From Swiss-Prot:
SUPFAM superfamilies: LeuD/IlvD-like. It catalyses: (2R,3S)-3-isopropylmalate = (2S)-2-isopropylmalate. It is an enzyme of class 4 (lyase). PANTHER family: 3-ISOPROPYLMALATE DEHYDRATASE SMALL SUBUNIT, 3-ISOPROPYLMALATE DEHYDRATASE SMALL SUBUNIT 2-RELATED-RELATED. It comes from Neisseria meningitidis serogroup C / serotype 2a (strain ATCC 700532 / DSM 15464 / FAM18). GO terms for molecular function: 3-isopropylmalate dehydratase activity. Keywords: Amino-acid biosynthesis, Branched-chain amino acid biosynthesis, Leucine biosynthesis, Lyase. Catalyzes the isomerization between 2-isopropylmalate and 3-isopropylmalate, via the formation of 2-isopropylmaleate. This is 3-isopropylmalate dehydratase small subunit. One of its GO terms (cellular component) is 3-isopropylmalate dehydratase complex. One of its GO terms (biological process) is L-leucine biosynthetic process. Heterodimer of LeuC and LeuD. Its EC number is 4.2.1.33. Pathway: Amino-acid biosynthesis; L-leucine biosynthesis; L-leucine from 3-methyl-2-oxobutanoate: step 2/4.
Amino acid sequence: MKAFTKITAIVAPLDRSNVDTDAIIPKQFLKSIKRSGFGPNAFDEWRYLDHGEPGMDNSKRPLNPDFSLNQPRYQGAQILLTRKNFGCGSSREHAPWALDDYGFRAVIAPSFADIFFNNCYKNGLLPIVLTEEQVDRLFKEVEANEGYQLSIDLAEQTLTTPGGETFTFDITEHRKHCLLNGLDEIGLTLQHADEIHAFEEKRRQSQPWLFNG
């Protein structure tokens, strides 16, 4: 998992509430259990004018010019700004995989669906909760300023605008530690590999019948 420390990046607006996981990555693309390769189909039904299916050459598909992420000014964005209850619907972990593979490192919203919120942290994607008033202000600034960028400092838990205004956000110490160090659940477990091996060896000696056969 990629570590997250600091970024300064373009912000792409998605001015919709209640964006569900089927909108983030439609169900027909869920056949793979690899974490990569979902980016070209993120927001597929809004992003393209035709119906997408696995195996299609996305470079030849007609783009929807009205979809914000297709606009030239938002190309290369690493921060997604959206509205309340983002990531609702089914619990598919493919949704944060698709956002990460698209290139997003952080998502800002007034609220997130709980399962999606937790899945973001497991996959190196930082979900930032701000108030609706703060999100409204950011939408206005993004719309008014082409190439608008925000700076996110995870260690300090701050988000800074080009004008120097700073917002703070909450995150548990455990989640912050994992993101700063690029640790998913497997990586976190491997940090304790020596203790695990020592425990297993001690148990092997004290309860050998468990290991016979």
